[in-house]
Protein backbone atom coordinates (compact mmCIF):
# COMPACT_ATOMS: atom_id res chain seq x y z
CA UNK A 1 0.00 0.00 0.00
CA UNK A 2 1.29 3.44 -0.91
CA UNK A 3 1.61 5.82 2.02
CA UNK A 4 0.53 9.46 1.77
CA UNK A 5 2.67 11.85 3.82
CA UNK A 6 1.42 15.33 4.69
CA UNK A 7 2.93 18.34 6.38
CA UNK A 8 0.92 21.41 7.28
CA UNK A 9 0.83 24.24 9.76
CA UNK A 10 -1.24 27.24 10.64
CA UNK A 11 -0.65 30.12 12.99
CA UNK A 12 -3.98 30.61 14.75
CA UNK A 13 -4.91 31.16 18.40
CA UNK A 14 -5.78 27.88 20.12
CA UNK A 15 -7.34 28.40 23.52
CA UNK A 16 -8.86 24.90 23.71
CA UNK A 17 -5.68 22.84 23.39
CA UNK A 18 -6.47 20.69 26.43
CA UNK A 19 -9.69 19.43 24.83
CA UNK A 20 -8.48 19.55 21.22
CA UNK A 21 -5.55 17.24 21.92
CA UNK A 22 -7.51 14.12 23.02
CA UNK A 23 -10.09 14.62 20.28
CA UNK A 24 -7.43 14.92 17.59
CA UNK A 25 -5.48 11.99 19.01
CA UNK A 26 -8.59 9.78 18.92
CA UNK A 27 -9.34 10.75 15.31
CA UNK A 28 -5.77 9.95 14.25
CA UNK A 29 -5.74 6.64 16.13
CA UNK A 30 -9.05 5.61 14.57
CA UNK A 31 -7.46 6.08 11.14
CA UNK A 32 -4.20 4.28 12.06
CA UNK A 33 -2.15 7.39 11.31
CA UNK A 34 1.45 7.83 12.44
CA UNK A 35 3.46 11.01 12.89
CA UNK A 36 3.51 14.09 15.09
CA UNK A 37 1.07 16.93 15.67
CA UNK A 38 2.08 19.91 17.80
CA UNK A 39 -0.51 22.19 19.41
CA UNK A 40 0.53 25.51 20.92
CA UNK A 41 -1.13 28.81 21.80
CA UNK A 42 0.12 30.13 18.44
CA UNK A 43 -1.23 27.30 16.26
CA UNK A 44 -0.83 23.78 14.88
CA UNK A 45 2.03 21.93 13.16
CA UNK A 46 1.29 18.60 11.47
CA UNK A 47 3.38 15.71 10.13
CA UNK A 48 1.21 12.65 9.46
CA UNK A 49 1.32 9.59 7.23
CA UNK A 50 -1.19 6.89 6.36
CA UNK A 51 -3.49 5.60 3.66
CA UNK A 52 -5.13 7.98 1.20
CA UNK A 53 -8.49 7.42 2.85
CA UNK A 54 -7.07 8.07 6.32
CA UNK A 55 -5.26 11.25 5.29
CA UNK A 56 -8.28 12.63 3.45
CA UNK A 57 -10.39 11.79 6.49
CA UNK A 58 -8.22 13.61 9.03
CA UNK A 59 -7.80 16.65 6.77
CA UNK A 60 -11.57 16.79 6.33
CA UNK A 61 -12.07 16.49 10.08
CA UNK A 62 -9.67 19.35 10.74
CA UNK A 63 -11.16 21.57 8.04
CA UNK A 64 -14.59 21.17 9.62
CA UNK A 65 -13.18 23.41 12.36
CA UNK A 66 -13.41 27.00 11.07
CA UNK A 67 -9.93 27.74 12.39
CA UNK A 68 -8.43 25.12 10.05
CA UNK A 69 -10.80 25.52 7.10
CA UNK A 70 -8.00 26.81 4.87
CA UNK A 71 -5.39 24.26 5.96
CA UNK A 72 -3.28 23.44 2.89
CA UNK A 73 -1.19 20.29 3.44
CA UNK A 74 1.81 19.48 1.26
CA UNK A 75 1.84 15.85 0.12
CA UNK A 76 4.46 13.31 -0.84
CA UNK A 77 4.31 9.54 -1.33
CA UNK A 78 6.35 6.65 0.03
CA UNK A 79 6.26 2.87 -0.11
CA UNK A 80 6.60 2.50 3.65
CA UNK A 81 5.31 4.25 6.76
CA UNK A 82 8.07 6.77 7.65
CA UNK A 83 6.95 7.24 11.26
CA UNK A 84 7.15 4.69 14.06
CA UNK A 85 4.43 6.08 16.30
CA UNK A 86 1.77 8.75 16.75
CA UNK A 87 2.29 11.77 18.99
CA UNK A 88 -0.08 14.68 19.62
CA UNK A 89 1.77 17.05 21.92
CA UNK A 90 1.15 20.36 23.67
CA UNK A 91 4.00 22.85 23.23
CA UNK A 92 4.74 26.49 24.02
CA UNK A 93 5.48 27.19 20.34
CA UNK A 94 4.89 25.11 17.21
CA UNK A 95 8.41 26.10 16.16
CA UNK A 96 10.67 27.24 18.98
CA UNK A 97 12.23 30.67 18.50
CA UNK A 98 11.81 32.08 22.03
CA UNK A 99 10.61 35.42 20.74
CA UNK A 100 7.08 35.47 22.22
CA UNK A 101 6.23 38.89 20.74
CA UNK A 102 6.42 37.45 17.23
CA UNK A 103 2.82 36.49 16.47
CA UNK A 104 2.41 35.46 12.82
CA UNK A 105 -1.37 35.40 13.23
CA UNK A 106 -1.31 39.17 13.76
CA UNK A 107 0.52 39.85 10.50
CA UNK A 108 3.03 38.07 8.32
CA UNK A 109 5.77 39.00 5.90
CA UNK A 110 4.78 38.85 2.22
CA UNK A 111 4.93 35.34 0.82
CA UNK A 112 6.54 34.69 -2.54
CA UNK A 113 5.00 32.02 -4.81
CA UNK A 114 7.52 29.46 -6.12
CA UNK A 115 6.91 30.48 -9.74
CA UNK A 116 7.72 34.11 -8.95
CA UNK A 117 10.89 33.12 -7.10
CA UNK A 118 12.03 31.01 -10.05
CA UNK A 119 11.44 33.96 -12.38
CA UNK A 120 13.43 36.28 -10.14
CA UNK A 121 16.30 33.80 -9.94
CA UNK A 122 16.18 33.24 -13.70
CA UNK A 123 16.48 36.96 -14.38
CA UNK A 124 18.97 37.65 -11.57
CA UNK A 125 16.94 40.28 -9.71
CA UNK A 126 13.46 41.04 -8.40
CA UNK A 127 10.86 43.06 -10.31
CA UNK A 128 12.33 46.32 -8.97
CA UNK A 129 15.84 45.43 -10.08
CA UNK A 130 17.19 44.57 -6.61
CA UNK A 131 19.60 41.71 -6.03
CA UNK A 132 17.84 38.66 -4.55
CA UNK A 133 19.46 36.92 -1.59
CA UNK A 134 18.24 33.45 -0.62
CA UNK A 135 18.46 32.99 3.17
CA UNK A 136 18.35 29.44 4.53
CA UNK A 137 16.78 29.43 8.01
CA UNK A 138 17.38 25.72 8.64
CA UNK A 139 19.97 23.93 10.75
CA UNK A 140 23.41 23.26 9.34
CA UNK A 141 22.94 19.50 8.98
CA UNK A 142 19.80 20.11 6.90
CA UNK A 143 21.60 22.59 4.67
CA UNK A 144 24.32 20.00 4.02
CA UNK A 145 21.76 17.76 2.27
CA UNK A 146 20.74 20.47 -0.19
CA UNK A 147 19.91 24.15 -0.53
CA UNK A 148 19.36 26.91 -3.07
CA UNK A 149 22.43 27.81 -5.11
CA UNK A 150 24.50 30.56 -3.44
CA UNK A 151 22.12 30.72 -0.47
CA UNK A 152 23.28 32.42 2.72
CA UNK A 153 23.23 30.19 5.79
CA UNK A 154 24.76 30.53 9.24
CA UNK A 155 25.41 26.93 10.31
CA UNK A 156 22.95 27.16 13.17
CA UNK A 157 22.27 24.09 15.30
CA UNK A 158 18.74 25.10 16.31
CA UNK A 159 16.26 27.77 15.31
CA UNK A 160 16.77 29.77 18.51
CA UNK A 161 20.23 30.66 17.15
CA UNK A 162 18.75 32.41 14.11
CA UNK A 163 17.86 35.80 15.72
CA UNK A 164 21.42 36.54 16.97
CA UNK A 165 22.88 35.28 13.69
CA UNK A 166 20.76 37.58 11.55
CA UNK A 167 21.38 40.50 13.91
CA UNK A 168 25.13 40.09 13.42
CA UNK A 169 24.75 40.16 9.62
CA UNK A 170 21.88 42.61 9.19
CA UNK A 171 23.97 45.15 7.29
CA UNK A 172 24.85 42.54 4.64
CA UNK A 173 21.32 42.85 3.23
CA UNK A 174 21.10 46.62 2.79
CA UNK A 175 19.44 47.46 -0.52
CA UNK A 176 18.77 43.81 -1.33
CA UNK A 177 15.66 41.64 -1.42
CA UNK A 178 15.83 38.77 1.06
CA UNK A 179 13.82 35.57 0.55
CA UNK A 180 13.83 33.33 3.63
CA UNK A 181 13.16 29.64 3.10
CA UNK A 182 12.93 26.37 5.01
CA UNK A 183 11.46 22.90 4.50
CA UNK A 184 7.74 23.64 4.59
CA UNK A 185 7.33 27.31 5.43
CA UNK A 186 6.95 27.50 9.19
CA UNK A 187 10.48 28.56 10.16
CA UNK A 188 10.90 31.00 7.29
CA UNK A 189 7.58 32.61 8.20
CA UNK A 190 8.75 33.41 11.72
CA UNK A 191 12.20 34.36 10.43
CA UNK A 192 10.78 36.82 7.91
CA UNK A 193 8.64 38.53 10.55
CA UNK A 194 11.66 38.82 12.83
CA UNK A 195 13.76 40.34 10.04
CA UNK A 196 11.08 42.93 9.40
CA UNK A 197 10.98 43.78 13.10
CA UNK A 198 14.74 44.45 13.21
CA UNK A 199 14.46 46.83 10.29
CA UNK A 200 15.09 44.88 7.08
CA UNK A 201 12.84 46.38 4.43
CA UNK A 202 12.56 44.01 1.48
CA UNK A 203 11.81 40.63 3.05
CA UNK A 204 9.77 37.72 1.70
CA UNK A 205 9.14 34.15 2.79
CA UNK A 206 9.07 31.35 0.23
CA UNK A 207 5.44 30.24 0.12
CA UNK A 208 5.24 26.60 1.23
CA UNK A 209 8.99 26.25 1.60
CA UNK A 210 11.29 23.99 -0.40
CA UNK A 211 8.74 21.20 -0.71
CA UNK A 212 6.19 23.51 -2.35
CA UNK A 213 8.91 24.83 -4.65
CA UNK A 214 9.78 21.25 -5.69
CA UNK A 215 6.10 20.49 -6.25
CA UNK A 216 5.40 23.53 -8.42
CA UNK A 217 8.61 24.29 -10.32
CA UNK A 218 11.07 21.44 -9.71
CA UNK A 219 14.72 21.79 -8.76
CA UNK A 220 15.77 24.84 -10.80
CA UNK A 221 18.36 26.86 -8.84
CA UNK A 222 18.44 24.19 -6.11
CA UNK A 223 21.36 21.82 -5.50
CA UNK A 224 20.85 18.49 -3.73
CA UNK A 225 17.86 17.12 -1.85
CA UNK A 226 15.64 18.38 0.97
CA UNK A 227 16.10 17.00 4.48
CA UNK A 228 12.88 15.90 6.20
CA UNK A 229 12.36 14.92 9.83
CA UNK A 230 11.21 11.34 9.36
CA UNK A 231 12.66 7.99 8.33
CA UNK A 232 12.91 9.03 4.68
CA UNK A 233 15.65 11.51 5.71
CA UNK A 234 15.61 13.39 2.38
CA UNK A 235 13.33 13.99 -0.61
CA UNK A 236 14.38 14.75 -4.16
CA UNK A 237 12.73 17.25 -6.49
CA UNK A 238 10.11 14.62 -7.41
CA UNK A 239 9.22 14.45 -3.69
CA UNK A 240 10.45 10.87 -3.54
CA UNK A 241 12.88 9.46 -0.94
CA UNK A 242 16.45 10.29 -1.93
CA UNK A 243 19.78 8.61 -1.15
CA UNK A 244 20.89 10.17 2.17
CA UNK A 245 20.11 8.38 5.44
CA UNK A 246 20.27 9.58 9.02
CA UNK A 247 22.40 7.71 11.52
CA UNK A 248 20.30 6.74 14.53
CA UNK A 249 23.38 6.71 16.77
CA UNK A 250 24.82 10.21 16.19
CA UNK A 251 21.98 11.74 14.08
CA UNK A 252 24.40 12.75 11.29
CA UNK A 253 23.24 12.63 7.67
CA UNK A 254 25.04 9.82 5.82
CA UNK A 255 25.50 10.29 2.07
CA UNK A 256 25.13 7.38 -0.39
CA UNK A 257 28.93 7.37 -0.74
CA UNK A 258 29.41 7.21 3.03
CA UNK A 259 26.95 4.32 3.19
CA UNK A 260 29.52 2.23 1.29
CA UNK A 261 32.02 2.61 4.15
CA UNK A 262 32.84 -0.32 6.41
CA UNK A 263 32.07 2.06 9.28
CA UNK A 264 28.42 2.23 8.22
CA UNK A 265 26.11 -0.30 9.89
CA UNK A 266 22.45 0.75 9.50
CA UNK A 267 20.84 1.51 12.83
CA UNK A 268 24.15 1.16 14.70
CA UNK A 269 26.93 3.46 13.50
CA UNK A 270 28.31 5.51 10.63
CA UNK A 271 31.59 7.14 9.51
CA UNK A 272 30.65 10.25 11.50
CA UNK A 273 30.44 8.12 14.66
CA UNK A 274 33.95 6.84 13.90
CA UNK A 275 35.20 10.42 13.46
CA UNK A 276 33.67 11.46 16.78
CA UNK A 277 35.29 8.49 18.53
CA UNK A 278 38.68 9.22 16.95
CA UNK A 279 38.58 12.87 18.06
CA UNK A 280 37.53 11.86 21.56
CA UNK A 281 40.48 9.49 21.80
CA UNK A 282 43.06 12.18 20.95
Curated annotation (Swiss-Prot):
The keyword Oxidoreductase applies. One of its GO terms (biological process) is tRNA modification. It comes from the Bacteria. Residues 128-222 form the Rhodanese domain. The keyword Oxidoreductase applies. Belongs to the TrhO family. This is tRNA uridine(34) hydroxylase. The gene is trhO.
Amino acid sequence: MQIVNISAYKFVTLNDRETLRPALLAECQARDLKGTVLLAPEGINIFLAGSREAIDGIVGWLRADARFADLAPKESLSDHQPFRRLLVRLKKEIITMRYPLIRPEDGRAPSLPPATLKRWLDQGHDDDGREVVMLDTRNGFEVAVGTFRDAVEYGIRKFTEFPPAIAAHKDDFAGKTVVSFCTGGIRCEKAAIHMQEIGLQHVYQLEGGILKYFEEVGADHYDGDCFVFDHRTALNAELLPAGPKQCFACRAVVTPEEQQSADYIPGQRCPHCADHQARAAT
